[in-house]
């Protein structure tokens, strides 16, 4: 699973995800992509599950690019622990995703296979997404 090798700080504020994505909104590598339509934190496990679904549907042909990286530590407190007494320990890593962000890109497969693969990958994610393709690749 994806996670940073090292970070400046162990824990991060929860924060909110406002506005639209400024960068990472265009297809840069592949011919087809999956674009986020909602703001959400996507965990490293969800990214990996989606990647596996996409590569399986493509029958190992073509190439997949992951355009998001889980760089935010998410901390939780254990079950049945009283409020207070500090912030919990980091449990997993998540990527903050804004609407308009390209999540995955693929190439080297026909458009029908690409659409099927990305829809199977989208089913593993907690947000609404949209299939996009490069203009001229019909």
Curated annotation (Swiss-Prot):
Membrane-spanning ranges: none
Keyword tags: Ribonucleoprotein, Ribosomal protein, RNA-binding, rRNA-binding, tRNA-binding
Entry keyword annotation includes Ribonucleoprotein: yes
Gene Ontology cellular component annotations, sorted alphabetically: cytosolic large ribosomal subunit
Single GO MF descriptor: rRNA binding
InterPro entries xref list: Ribosomal_uL16, Ribosomal_uL16_bact-type, Ribosomal_uL16_CS, Ribosomal_uL16_dom, Ribosomal_uL16_sf
Listed GO biological process terms: translation
CDD domains from the UniProt entry: Ribosomal_L16_L10e
A Pfam family that the UniProt record links to this protein: Ribosomal_L16
Gene3D superfamilies xrefs: Ribosomal protein L10e/L16
Subunit structure: Part of the 50S ribosomal subunit.
Reported function: Binds 23S rRNA and is also seen to make contacts with the A and possibly P site tRNAs.
Record PANTHER family: 50S/60S RIBOSOMAL PROTEIN L16, LARGE RIBOSOMAL SUBUNIT PROTEIN UL16M
Name of the protein: Large ribosomal subunit protein uL16
This protein's encoding gene: rplP
